[in-house]
Regions:
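Oligomerization/assembly interface segments of phage tail-like spikes and tubes
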Residues: 79-94, 104-105, 181-189
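Short, solvent-exposed beta-strand/turn "edge" segments of beta-rich domains on protein surfaces
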Residues: 74-80, 95-97, 174-178
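Short, intrinsically disordered, mixed-charge
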Residues: 20, 104-115
Length: 198
C-alpha cells in the first residue's frame, strides 16, 4: 500500500538525484561557487542581487493517470488513486552562465535517469530519517522516512514535457514569479491505494 506521503517522497527522491548528480559532476568548481537544490514554489526563491546558484524543483501540477487506475481495479478491491506528477525544474544564478551550466547538468541527469529504481527510492527514503551534520531532521523529513514508496510495484518514469513558449509563459505568469530558464517533467505513475471499494 502506498501512503499519501508518495507525492513528497517522489519530490525528495528527485531532489536527492539532482543534489548527488551535481556533486558527482563537479558543478561547484565549474560555476565558481556553492550550489544548492530546493523544492519550493518559485516565488519563494530569492532573486536579484542576493540570487545564488541553485536548482529548484517545484511540483506545479498533479493529474489523473486513468490508464494505471483502470488497470488496477478489480471488483471488490479498493480503487487506487493513480497520479502523474508534473515538475518545473528551474536554474538560478548570480553570475554569467551559471544558470545554463546548472540547467545543462540537471537536464543530463534527468535524461540519464528515465526510471526511478526501487533501490534508489529505498536508499533516499531511508536516509531521510538520519541527522545531517548533527542537526535535527525536520518533522516533514522524518515523516517521509516512513513512506513505503520503494515497496510499490509500479515503475516511476521520468518523462520530459516540452512546453512551448506560450505554455511556459502562462505557467510562469500563474506562478507570479520572475521567469528563469526551466524545463518540465512528468513522473508517472504514482499510485495511492484507496479505501473506496470498486
Amino acid at each position: 500500500m502506498t501512503s499519501a506521503l508518495a507525492l513528497a517522497s517522489v519530490t525528495a527522491v528527485l531532489k536527492d538525484l539532482l543534489e548527488n548528480g551535481l556533486a558527482r559532476g563537479g558543478v561547484t568548481s565549474k560555476i565558481g561557487g556553492d550550489t544548492s537544490v530546493s523544492a519550493l514554489p518559485p516565488d519563494r526563491i530569492t532573486a536579484g542581487t542576493d540570487e545564488k546558484a541553485q536548482l529548484n524543483l517545484f511540483l506545479y501540477s498533479v493529474t489523473a493517470n486513468t490508464r494505471v487506475r483502470s488497470d488496477r481495479v478489480t471488483p471488490g478491491s479498493a480503487v487506487p488513486l493513480a497520479l502523474d506528477l508534473h515538475y518545473l525544474l528551474t536554474a538560478y544564478g548570480a553570475q554569467d552562465f551559471q544558470t545554463e551550466i546548472l540547467l545543462g547538468h540537471a537536464l543530463q541527469l534527468m535524461h540519464e535517469t528515465p526510471v526511478l529504481e526501487r533501490e534508489r527510492i529505498r536508499r533516499t527514503i531511508d536516509n531521510l530519517s538520519h541527522t545531517k551534520d548533527r542537526r535535527v531532521v525536520a518533522p516533514a523529513l522524518a515523516a517521509l522516512a516512513k513512506s513505503d514508496l520503494a515497496d510499490r510495484v509500479e515503475r516511476l518514469e521520468i518523462i520530459p514535457e516540452f512546453l512551448g513558449g506560450e505554455e511556459m509563459s502562462k505557467l510562469w505568469s500563474a506562478l507570479q514569479a520572475k521567469y528563469r530558464p526551466s524545463a518540465t517533467y512528468k513522473v508517472s505513475a504514482v499510485v495511492i491505494d484507496g479505501a473506496v471499494q470498486a
